[in-house]
């Protein structure tokens, strides 16, 4: 109860980015593109951003949210590449998609990760003010900070869902669950420790 009250106060006092509201015409363009290509590459997202006059990061988040609402699963890279290569000659559109430039994964230094992780432990749901302050402190765009926090929350939630099963199996073998020993995928914002303030899934 105390933790819930604490989280509520944090969210209430921390300003959040206003939700991007797209016009009917913008949504028509986005939905049409989504129906053809639910996993657009970086070049496509840049083109869409110019076409509807918004930031590329807003396009990326819109596609992420829409895929989540429609139950899309992240496609394995190997499967995607194999599919593109096998169909590329017969379908120019697929060939173009496979060659399309993608945004490079943001790589953080140890110092930047330390700052991000420390901030996450204090507040897993930072508002726009906190994210902009973090972005300025570590020298990256605010949109990268937002995505880092999103990835960290979703992966931590997934790990916690798996922990009960893993704990039971390891307990039967008399071992300590590996997932509870602090394994971390730092570049993607994933910390698997169980002492975080993270309290479950939440929609941005």
UniProtKB/Swiss-Prot annotation:
The UniProt record lists the keyword Nucleotide-binding: no
Principal localisation: nucleus
A cellular-component GO term for this protein: nucleus
InterPro entries in the record: HD, Homeobox_regulator, Homeodomain-like_sf, HTH_motif
Biased composition (Polar residues): 81-90, 184-197
Pfam families per record: Homeodomain
UniProt keyword terms in alphabetical order: DNA-binding, Homeobox, Nucleus, Repeat, Repressor, Transcription, Transcription regulation
Keyword field contains Transcription: yes
GO MF annotation list: DNA-binding transcription factor activity, RNA polymerase II-specific; RNA polymerase II transcription regulatory region sequence-specific DNA binding; sequence-specific double-stranded DNA binding
Entries under PROSITE patterns matching the protein: HOMEOBOX_2 (PS50071)
Tissues and organs where the protein is expressed, per its UniProt entry: Expressed in embryonic stem cells.
Localization annotation: Nucleus
GO terms (BP aspect): regulation of transcription by RNA polymerase II
DNA-binding feature ranges: 15-74, 101-160
Region (Disordered): 73-101, 163-204
Family: Belongs to the paired homeobox family.
Its job: Transcription factor that acts as a repressor.
Name under which the protein is recorded: Double homeobox protein A
Annotated source species: Homo sapiens (Human)
Gene coding for it: DUXA
């Amino acid at each position: 109860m105390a933790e819930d009250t604490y989280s509520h106060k944090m969210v209430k006092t921390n300003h959040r980015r206003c939700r991007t509201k797209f016009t009917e015409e913008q949504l028509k363009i986005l939905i049409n593109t989504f129906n053809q290509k639910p996993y657009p590459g970086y070049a496509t997202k840049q083109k869409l951003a110019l076409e509807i006059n918004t930031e590329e990061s807003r396009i990326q988040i819109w596609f992420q949210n829409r895929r989540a609402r429609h139950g899309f699963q992240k496609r394995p890279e190997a499967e995607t590449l194999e599919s593109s290569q096998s169909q590329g000659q017969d379908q120019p559109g697929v060939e173009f998609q496979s060659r399309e430039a993608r945004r490079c994964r943001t790589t953080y230094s140890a110092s930047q990760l330390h700052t991000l992780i420390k901030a996450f432990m204090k507040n897993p749901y930072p508002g726009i003010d906190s994210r902009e302050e973090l972005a300025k402190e570590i020298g990256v765009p605010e949109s990268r900070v937002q995505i880092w926090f999103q990835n960290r929350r979703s992966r931590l939630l997934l790990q916690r869902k798996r922990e009960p099963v893993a704990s039971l199996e390891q307990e039967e073998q008399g071992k300590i669950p590996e997932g509870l020993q602090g394994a971390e995928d730092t570049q993607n914002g994933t910390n698997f420790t169980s002492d975080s303030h993270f309290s479950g899934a939440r929609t941005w």
